[in-house]
């Protein structure tokens, strides 16, 4: 996020943050040299085989799942394995897919993707636990109100967060709370009747998996200056002030 009053030397500040957040010092012990003079002309080649800084991409988790089940990594899976250390399912872990039918849960693609990632020393981000756009929820879910709706929300949280506790390091808990008109989506408020429902959702998720980082996520915040930036800040500030355990924020961008 770069505000209107961005610093003139923003690239310089960014490089300072890279030095601070993405890099660390390393010590190399060299044995077999009798004196420091022997090391004057020593040439040392270091090849980095992996890194701790998360660098990932969205993938079609059905294709990853197919690779896992077949035991063969096709070109798609091989490319993901070679270039990234973190994955996020574009669709297959979202509630609309996992819970198409009431009281039925389809975690097959998600489970297989997590297992495939573990085999290849990769991580999977949970995306997304809940979605604030009404139309992106199962039809049966959209017809619930009051206590029945809240129970369905909690069932989704309990099922998904508990299932991947210790396996998924991060969850996008509530996805896209800003609509096309730059106003807050009120799906959870409208259906639950509870003005504090968003905070309760985060609190329940954190209680089930304390070690998992919980995120808000939204799109069009960085490159759209029509009010989404300010509204996102307002949402975050309001939730933090109400005691919502938010560990990070997502800035979703799609580029081709």
Regions found by a protein language model. Name each.
Residues 1-63, 86, 95-99, 125, ...:
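Beta-strand-rich domain onsets/edges
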Residues 32, 213-216, 240-256:
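Substrate-binding and catalytic surfaces of secreted/luminal carbohydrate-active proteins
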Residues 28, 87, 117, 160, ...:
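Conserved, mostly hydrophobic/aromatic
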Residues 99-109, 136-234:
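Active-site cleft segment of glycoside hydrolase catalytic domains centered on the general acid/base Glu
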Residues 61-63, 93, 130-132, 175-179, ...:
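Active-site-proximal loop/turn and secondary-structure-junction residues that shape catalytic pockets
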Residues 49-111, 116-123, 128-148, 250:
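N-terminal substrate-binding region of glycoside hydrolase catalytic domains
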Residues 65-76, 182-185, 224-242:
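Distinct, well-ordered alpha-helical segments
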